[in-house]
UniProtKB/Swiss-Prot annotation:
Name of the protein described by the UniProt record: Protein PsbN
Keyword list, A-Z: Chloroplast, Membrane, Plastid, Thylakoid, Transmembrane, Transmembrane helix
Subcellular localization(s) per the UniProt record: Plastid, Chloroplast thylakoid membrane
Function, in words: May play a role in photosystem I and II biogenesis.
GO BP terms: photosynthesis
GO cellular component: a single term: chloroplast thylakoid membrane
Keyword DNA-binding on entry: no
Chain's gene name: psbN
């Protein structure tokens, strides 16, 4: 198997999974309490 291609594939896969996990943590985890909702701020 091509070692550089395998290393690059594993690196990119880990990068994508870590970014996805971090964004889910920010969106739904404890830090989500600090996010503001622009729709709640705009009252008609």
């Amino acid at each position: 198997m091509e070692t550089p291609a395998l290393v690059a594939t594993v690196f990119v896969s880990c990068l994508v999974l870590s970014i996805t996990g971090y964004s889910l943590y920010i969106g739904f985890g404890p830090p989500s309490k600090e996010l503001r909702d622009p729709f709640d701020e705009h009252e008609d």
